[in-house]
Amino acid sequence: MSKGKLEQVSAACHHLGFFNNAGLSAHYKLSESSSPAVADLRGLVYAAAGDLLRKHRILFAIPVNEGTPNPHFACLPWIDLRRSIAFLERSVPLASAAEEQDKELDAILEEQHNIDFQTDYGTLPFWRLIILRSKGRNDFTASFIYHHAIGDGVSGLAFHKAFCNALEAASSSTLPTDRAENIIRPDENTVVLPPLEELHPMPISPRQPPLPTASPKEWTGASIHLPCKSRWASLYISPSASNAFVQECKEMKLSVTSALSSVVAAVLFDNLPSRVEALTCIIPVSVRPWLKLPPQVIDNAIGTYFDALRVRLTRAEQRSQDPSPVGIWCGARQVSRSINAYLCDVSPSGEPYTSVAAFKTVPDVSAVFRSTLGKPRDAAFEVTNVGLFPPAAIRRPSRWKAGNVLLSRSAAVPGAAVTVSVVTGRDGTMALGFSWQEGVVEDGFMHRVRQGVWKYFEKYQS
């Protein structure tokens, strides 16, 4: 199975130790109207995972020849769930949204994001599932950790949407879960979806990029270097505060992503020396709306289908029109204009021009990434917002409720100094995750940034 350029980029970064994996965690709780407890959670998870795997062939795929100019996918003949799913038990009760952070889950995620998929290569899939069970038998958190060539951030939502449905089906089944299979083979009637190049024309803009102008003093953290140790911390915004923030964004006619990007920029400016005049932000953009696939396939696809844009935010512009301690709306409008310009800059065939199209002209992406070592990075921060975990398609009483969700990832060696990953759960809680590379920014600095973001949202708390 051939790889597209986005998959090749992820494969090269994994091979070089530049990026290990992404993750999406979701908390599941048995409804009070259901049976009092789950007697065999392991069997139930195995049954749900087996059902899901048979529907998503990509989860059997492993990258081959990652460090070469022509990597490709091979398909495992089977997956042993006993080796790919780990069961842990919480040592302390699950933190509530009011407590801002799930430190126990954060520690697990940080460990997972520092573990690649090289061990037992050829026998294990390039994903793993961590089940963190609360004391008692009625709720758990499932963390899906996966290679970026297998899926993007939206794919994490697709996985949990499928897992939630499979969990419900397994709970409703009359078959005993203690007989659930642990060896899962792919359904030969399923296929790996094509790469981006086969579903999108990936047009390259005929316009030349603007000539460089005098650059203000920017901050991008320490230069690009190895080795990479990823650091991680989460922040949960309550449903009431999240809803109030979203409503204010709507009143301002701005997207949540635009506003969040400006919040992070404002907090960074507040924690950086006054001589820092500008910050560049990377914003990933899903290109799924323009893929040549039926909507129902796109919505449930696990694959790599995204692009990214950049916007420069300046301290002067942010402060000149908004003198409040953390003024964000001027910056949010600037981000919004950049997003709209990206979406409106369309090719003759109707799709926006993509920045990832430039990789089509690169024969060996590994060489490109190796050449970045020792050089300054080109962005201060990235904000990835995958939106809302979609509600169940069938509105009927269900045994399992999916609540908090959390998007997470390794630090990217050649990427932005700070990455903020955002997702909103079915319960309305908006979760922000902060990842950074040790040695690129200090832990104390990131603690202040996280606290600054939390302080901004305090005004929305009811």
From Swiss-Prot:
Name of the protein: Probable alcohol acetyltransferase crmB
Triggers of expression: Expressed in copper depleted conditions via the regulation of the macA transcription factor.
Its job: Probable alcohol acetyltransferase; part of the crm gene cluster that mediates the biosynthesis of a yet unidentified copper-responsive metabolite. In contrast to crmA, is not involved in the biosynthesis of fumivalines or fumicicolins.
Pathway(s) this gene product operates in, as recorded in its UniProt entry: Secondary metabolite biosynthesis
The UniProt record lists the keyword Transferase: yes
The protein's Enzyme Commission number: 2.3.1.-
Matches recorded under Gene3D superfamilies: Chloramphenicol acetyltransferase-like domain
Family: Belongs to the alcohol acetyltransferase FCK4 family.
Domain of life: Eukaryota
